[in-house]
Structure formats: C-alpha cells, structure tokens
Amino acid sequence: MNAKPMRIFLDTDIGPDCDDTAALAILLQRCREGSAALIGVTHCTGSRYGLACIDSICRAFGVRVPLGTCPDRDFLSDGVALRYTKPVSETFPHGFPPDAPQPDALGTCIDALSKEEDGSVTMIAIGPLNNLARFLSDPVCGPLMQKKVRRIVTMAGCFDADPVFTEWNVEMDIPAARTVFEKWTGPLDACPWEAAGSVLTGACLKEYPDNPAALAYRIYCGEKMLRPSWDLATVEMALGEVSGMEWSEDGRIEIDAKGVTRFSPDKAGNRRYARLTDAEAAARALENVLRRAAETMTRQ
C-alpha cells in the first residue's frame, strides 16, 4: 500500500530570489505524483505581486491552493522583490490583481490547519520567519499550530561555513527567527546556507521556457539560468531524502541576538540541520524533479 501524501503548508518569500519559484514547482510536481498534498501557501513579504506569482505557478499545474500574504506592505517590497514577480504576473494568468485586497496570511493558516488531523502537517518555510512568528504568537493560530503541525522545515541558518555568518532569511527578521526556534515545541529541521549554496540548478528550465519558473530564472539569472538550490533542497529534504544530502544528529539550535545560529548535539533535542555530502549528486537529484515540473507546467 502506498503511503499517504504528506500534508504540506508552505510559507515563501517569493520575489527576492528566484529559487522559490522552482521550489514551489517541484512541490506541486510531488503533489501531482502523489507524495505530497499542498493545503495552503502564504507569502511573507509585502510585495503586491507575490500572490500573483504564486498563483500563476499553481495555475500552471492546473490547481488552486488557498493563499494569503503578509499585511506589512513595507517588508521586502522594494524593486528587488518585483524583479521577476511583476513580469511573471503580467505574462501568466492568476487571480490576484496587485491593487485589489489580498487575504491575510494569518487567516489562511488558521483556515487550512483547522481542517487537518492533529499532528498531520509539515510546515515548510523558505523565507524570513515573520509569518511563522506571527502564527505562533497569535492566540488562535499558535495553539492550532502546536496541535496540527508535526514538524517545521525551514531554509535558515549557517552552521558549518567558515567563517559562520548570519544567514539572509534569519537576518531579515532576527526577532522572528528567534521566536520560531524558541516557541515551536515540536521537531524543527533547518536547511542552512552551506547545505545548498554550491548546488546549482535551473538549467533544465531552458528546455521548457514557457512557464512562470523559467521566466523568473531567465530574468533573475540571465541566460545560464543557474542558481543555488537553497529552497529546492529544503522542500525535497522535507519530503524525504536527497542524494548527496543528509540530516545531522538530533540536537538543539540557538540563535543569538546577531542572528548567528549554533547547533549543539543532544540526544534529547528535536532540532537537526541538513548537511551536503555530494554537491553533484544533489544537483542531479534536484534538477531531475525540476525538469519533470517544468514539463508538467509547459504541457498544461
């Protein structure tokens, strides 16, 4: 008997980097293949084109997913965040006009989780943790998360680089990152910067140019269409294993006031982080599923 699809709630900052588009595409491809079920997506920046870009990718797969966005219109909403989201929204169909009211991420999360069985949801975060911190701090959503979510997997941190530095997703909202790592009582896995910074993917999108992810990569990366696979690796590691990557032993993760993340092995801990063992193998594995996703988007 096949395993039940993993119930996934995704939070993304789609806009400041293009790998979010590929990560969402491979997640939707995994849903199509039966290993995942996407129950909702929230956007954690203030860009008015974020939901349009997300919805355009979902529609490229022929699906509609409950969506919501960060209500703080000043958070990461400058020109960099619009670099590809605006062109994507102007090229592909979606249901979120930029000047129309957009659903609040908090309500989207509450609605999605309230329909799920206890301990059944994996929450994936591929951006700053402002939305998740808000969810956990809310008197309704916080207890609901602790009840319904089994595990959080986030692209965050830096553990093995030399020298260690404050990773971007953490740096953009250090208090939020500390809130999530401290308030969340369940298992939390981090896919840090060094785990996928040398794993380059996206070239396969040149073979299937007529889809939102391909346009995003072409605008962001130029004709080489190669980018580190931080968000792709986070999604795939949340769903299972990736060739060339592995999880650390159990332990604890602390984030200091400057946003530096530190891991301490502890058999009683419920935190892990991803390690890269073979960059070429990881790139092949991620590129293979991205190619299938691109083919699906192009044929819809």
Feature roles, as predicted:
Residues 1-300:
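N-terminal acidic, glycine/proline-rich low-complexity segments
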